[in-house]
Structure formats: C-alpha cells, structure tokens
Amino acid sequence: MNKTATCELLLFVSGEAGLTLTELSSLTEMSKQACQQQIDYLKEKYHSDRESALTIIETAGKYRMATKEDFSEILKNYAKTPLNQSLSKSALEVLSIIAYKQPLTRIEIDQLRGVNSSGVLSTLRAFDLVEKVGQVEAPGRPSLYATTEFFLDYIGINNLEELPEIDESRYVAEQQTLFNESEENENQ
C-alpha cells in the first residue's frame, strides 16, 4: 500500500481532531521520521498545486487536513446556504442545549442527550451557529462550545437574555416518563 496515500487517508478521516506523529506512526506502522517525510511531501504537494483547495496544518503537535485560506469565503458561503433548509431535530436539540447552558464541552452535551454529538457539533460549527470558545483545564483539554453572533442574528435576538425561559422541571418530568415507558416495554 502507498505510504503517502495511507498518511493522507488517515489525516483526512481524523478530521478536525488531527493526528500526532506518534499516532500516525502507530496507525501506519512506519517510523515517526517516515511519517514526517510523508507529511512534508503532502504539504509541499498541496502548497504547489494551485488546483487544490487543500493543505496540511500543524496545531498543538497535531497534523490535520484543512482548506487553504484563499477558499475561506467560498467555504463560509457554502456552510451558510443550508440554513435556508431546516436543521435536523438533533441539530436543534444540541443548539438549544448550548444556547441555554453555554459554555459546555461535547461530553457534557453527550451526557445531557445520551448520544454522541460530534457530527451535529461539526454541522453547527460549519453553519457558524456554534464555535469553540476555550478549553477546560482538565485531562485531554476538552473544547468549550458556545453560540455565535450569527446565531443571535439567525434567530432574531440581540442577546442570550432574550431567549424564552424554559421550564426545566417539565423537561425532566417528560424525560422520566419516556424512561419509565421504555423500561416497561423492555420488561414486557
């Protein structure tokens, strides 16, 4: 199998998280030096290819694929166009959680929802409704997410205080009812 293509594939599928040289080396069973050579080759290849919108960047010791800065406006315009369509229920749920409880980590969102929210968060970030606003000083340094100025414009409010109040006790009661019904169905 082609070493360059293997590194390129792994950088692509790692997405926003990226990979360290150690991780890439472990996944490819190549030395760190060999992985670095492949990354350097890919960086140069993308840099010199004026027909490609891709590049490889290094941030905090992790390598990831990204779009070249020249294409940022096109990407922003693309990301915003699907807003003419409706957001999925999952996206609306995550957006609501973030709007009312921000800032919070993906893990906190996952715990509130009971399912993984990575994909939905990526979608909301691509739509510029949610952004990373910092990191928690804890192992792994998880990112904190909050809504954007565009979110306020999109829903037509000036600040978060204008969000309608929610009755959390009603929400908790509804969740408990659903849980009890689910348990009853499993016991039958």
UniProtKB/Swiss-Prot annotation:
Cell compartments where the protein resides: Cytoplasm
InterPro entries in the cross-refs: ScpB_csome_segregation, WH-like_DNA-bd_sf, WH_DNA-bd_sf
Single GO cellular component term: cytoplasm
Classification via Gene3D superfamilies: Winged helix-like DNA-binding domain superfamily/Winged helix DNA-binding domain (1.10.10.10)
GO biological process, one term: chromosome separation
Known function: Participates in chromosomal partition during cell division. May act via the formation of a condensin-like complex containing Smc and ScpA that pull DNA away from mid-cell into both cell halves.
Subunit relationships: Homodimer. Homodimerization may be required to stabilize the binding of ScpA to the Smc head domains. Component of a cohesin-like complex composed of ScpA, ScpB and the Smc homodimer, in which ScpA and ScpB bind to the head domain of Smc. The presence of the three proteins is required for the association of the complex with DNA.
Recorded family membership: Belongs to the ScpB family.
Protein name: Segregation and condensation protein B
Gene: scpB
